Amino acid sequence: MELFGTDGVRGKAGKLLSAQLSMRLAMAAGIYFRKNSRTNKIVVGKDTRRSGYMIENALVSGLTAVGYNVIQVGPMPTPAIAFLTEDLRCDAGIMISASHNPYYDNGIKFFNHQGDKLQPEDEKAIEAIFFDEQTIEENQKTDQDIGSSKRIDDVIGRYIVHLKNSFPKDLTLNGLRVVIDTANGAAYKVAPTVFSELGAEVFVINDEPNGFNINEKCGAMYPGELAKKVREYRADIGFALDGDADRLVVVDEKGKIVPGDLVIGALATYLKQEGMLQADAIVATVMSNKALEDYLATLGIELVRSNVGDKYVLDEMKKRGINFGGESSGHIIFGDYSKTGDGIVTALQITAYMLRSQKGASEILYPFSLYPSKMENVTVKEKKPLETIEEFPELQKRIEKSGIRSLIRYSGTENKLRILLEGKDQKKLEKLMEELIQFFKERLS
């Protein structure tokens, strides 16, 4: 059994993610982190789900049982926990969140002492300890070796200062009207405070979490309400965060939702203009539109592609000395300020670009047009390696020659083959998609 998925351990709270599993996972992680412990402290944060209380208490029990001292900071964005892990000199950080998922799901994400998400080898080592009864028993502490726990409520101030430090010192948001949808999630206090303190007139929606309404028809997954409110309040821009605030969706002053690849392109333009872009390159995933790549090339910026997931984006950034990257889904990483996607940092950089350029959101956020794209799923009986399917290599060569970009891969969670096609000719795309669906149905369904 594998515990870790693409972003930590995630599942339905009380079922897959039970109190028992959470406590044992905390013990296993604590045993692993203590091997290279420097301070014997771990910080734990959460979003606003009701199940967060259960999981938090289970994690604290598990960590203190193996001798760790725990700092509990309550509801905080995921990027805040990444920041605080390093800022508070902790051995590790743990965030309890299922990000954009519904309230009944929850998850546990780990950060190392530098605030980075764990590498696969770290996760495998924790899993091995989790399933090793003897190691768990041998590391259970007694007497004065049992750890302690304390709750600190004022660390939110440290994160707010950090966010404001990411905004240019010579600018203020005075006169700017901003609507923020906090998705009834972890940033319901932080996001409005930061924008207000920088001088903006802030209108906040979905900022009354009750444990069950996180991401409920609101936030980054449902930006429709934000679009209406931007028009209603005649705001200059709108920002929708998800439940743990590592993702951002942007709405311009006309109430139009801006595609993520355009946001990435606009921010790359800004960083290049300001001389802040390192290595003349950015990282995006295999899902980003080819038009982004072609546009960046006109600016002398290389687009490096990574696998899907912000931790893979960050890995590629580190490898190549790049300080900016993101996913079209809204996870955007400014390497100078954050080790993970940070929706609030991204929102601040967009407003800085507006102020620097003295232009409205709609004037800066559409630097190019996306190429037509089409995505379809084919249900499959088995996930045969694609390269072993007869005639597939020849078909791939033909697609490449046609000038159409294709991404064909199996879903990680379902018995489905996902087909993404992109190109300048919509009719050509549709014809090829029909051919591919038929091809794979005959061979895999």
Curated annotation (Swiss-Prot):
Active site: S99 (phosphoserine intermediate)
Acetylation among keywords: no
Note on how the cofactor is bound: Binds 1 Mg(2+) ion per subunit.
Family matches, as InterPro entries: A-D-PHexomutase_a/b/a-I, A-D-PHexomutase_a/b/a-I/II/III, A-D-PHexomutase_a/b/a-II, A-D-PHexomutase_a/b/a-III, A-D-PHexomutase_C, A-D-PHexomutase_C_sf, A-D-PHexomutase_CS, Alpha-D-phosphohexomutase_SF
Residue positions where Phosphoserine is found in the record: S99
PTM comment: Activated by phosphorylation.
PROSITE patterns to which the protein is assigned, alphabetical: PGM_PMM
A molecular function (GO) term: magnesium ion binding
Cellular component, GO annotation: cytosol
Domain of life where this protein originates: Bacteria
Catalytic activity: alpha-D-glucosamine 1-phosphate = D-glucosamine 6-phosphate
EC numbers, comma separated: 5.4.2.10
Enzyme class label: isomerase
Cofactor: Mg(2+)
Residues holding Mg(2+): S99, D242, D244, D246
Gene3D superfamilies from the UniProt entry: Alpha-D-Glucose-1,6-Bisphosphate, subunit A, domain 3, Alpha-D-phosphohexomutase, C-terminal domain
Keyword entries, A-Z: Isomerase, Magnesium, Metal-binding, Phosphoprotein
Signal peptide interval: none
Biological processes annotated in GO: carbohydrate metabolic process; peptidoglycan biosynthetic process; UDP-N-acetylglucosamine biosynthetic process
NCBIfam families: glmM (TIGR01455), PRK10887.1 (NF008139)
Protein function: Catalyzes the conversion of glucosamine-6-phosphate to glucosamine-1-phosphate.
Family: Belongs to the phosphohexose mutase family.
Protein name: Phosphoglucosamine mutase
Species of origin: Nitratiruptor sp. (strain SB155-2)
Classification of source organism: Bacteria, Pseudomonadati, Campylobacterota, Epsilonproteobacteria, Nautiliales
